[in-house]
């Protein structure tokens, strides 16, 4: 068997030289560092089922205003680190005494990560196209490591979500997804996104989600085939309970290689 579900501390191999991402070596043996899918092709590696969001430069994320100071809006980013949006990074000229008129505590906003220092000071900006305050719709949260699966290879999955639900969709890198449309359409879209999160390690998921949103019965060959990920992550570094965007994209390509890519 080239792959299987494993838990932290599980013995994977006695060949320490084959240790790959998501593993550690102890007494000459390889053990799993994570709860996820182990791949035994080539180097022994483990891809986690879940992960935490760590802010990264250029990420678009959905944040909440938690405080307003004389020169900054302080944002909760869905990570261990709050972000700072300086008044100069707002798209309009704003006097510091009027900052709360534009954004106040509790407001939800799409921002871009401008910079992250070595000390994890997170600077945000709303000067990028697409940044805006969100006054309508709903926010859905998924595990951040599942974001590439929600987007899909080449944007295939998110394109289907938008087209078949008749809703606007914005996927933040921090696992927060904004949707906007009619209530019944948002209800169905929410269920579809939950399906993607819970079945992200299955193949044929893009077809399955599309059929669900169209109200079609399952039955297309391969649409609900249950297959563990044949992950190829040699050379990709993973930390405990964390997965890189590059790794997630590789997983997505492997999972959707039998499905049509819709742009």
Curated annotation (Swiss-Prot):
Which SMART domains would you find in this protein's record? KH (SM00322), S1 (SM00316)
Record's Gene3D superfamilies?
2.40.50.100, K Homology domain, type 1, Nucleic acid-binding proteins
GO terms under biological process:
CUT catabolic process; exonucleolytic trimming to generate mature 3'-end of 5.8S rRNA from tricistronic rRNA transcript (SSU-rRNA, 5.8S rRNA, LSU-rRNA); poly(A)-dependent snoRNA 3'-end processing; RNA catabolic process; U4 snRNA 3'-end processing
Q: Where in the cell is it found?
A: Cytoplasm
Keyword flag Cell membrane: no
One of the record's GO cellular component terms = cytoplasm
Which coarse location class applies to the principal site listed for this UniProt protein? cytoplasm
Query: Where are the residues of the annotated region Disordered?
Result: 213-263
- Name of one Pfam family that matches: KH_6
Q: What does this protein do?
A: Non-catalytic component of the exosome, which is a complex involved in RNA degradation. Increases the RNA binding and the efficiency of RNA degradation. Confers strong poly(A) specificity to the exosome.
Q: Can you name this protein?
A: Exosome complex component Rrp4
Q: What organism, scientifically named, is this protein from?
A: Methanococcoides burtonii (strain DSM 6242 / NBRC 107633 / OCM 468 / ACE-M)
Q: Which gene encodes it?
A: rrp4
């Amino acid at each position: 068997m080239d792959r299987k579900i494993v838990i932290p501390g599980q013995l994977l191999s006695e060949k320490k030289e084959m240790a790959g991402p998501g593993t550690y070596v102890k007494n000459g043996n390889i053990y799993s560092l994570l709860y996820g899918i182990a791949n035994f092709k080539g180097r022994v590696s483990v891809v986690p089922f879940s992960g935490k969001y760590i802010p990264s430069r250029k990420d678009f994320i959905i944040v909440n205003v938690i405080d307003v100071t004389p020169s900054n809006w302080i944002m909760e980013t869905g990570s261990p680190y709050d972000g700072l949006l300086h008044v100069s990074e707002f798209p309009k000229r704003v006097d510091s005494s009027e900052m709360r008129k534009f954004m106040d505590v509790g407001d939800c906003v799409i921002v871009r990560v401008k910079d992250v220092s070595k000390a994890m000071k997170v600077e945000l900006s709303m000067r990028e196209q697409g940044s805006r305050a969100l006054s309508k719709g709903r926010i859905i949260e998924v595990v951040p490591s599942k974001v590439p699966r929600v987007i899909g290879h080449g944007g295939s999955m998110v394109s289907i979500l938008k087209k078949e639900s008749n809703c606007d969709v914005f996927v933040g890198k921090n696992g927060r997804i904004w949707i906007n449309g009619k209530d019944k359409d948002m209800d169905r879209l929410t269920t579809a996104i939950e399906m993607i999160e819970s079945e992200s390690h299955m193949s044929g998921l893009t077809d399955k989600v599309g059929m669900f949103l169209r109200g079609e019965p399952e039955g297309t060959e391969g649409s609900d085939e249950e297959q563990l990920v044949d992950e190829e992550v040699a050379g990709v570094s993973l930390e405990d309970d964390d997965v890189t965007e590059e790794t997630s994209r590789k997983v997505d390509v492997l999972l959707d290689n039998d499905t049509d890519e819709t742009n």
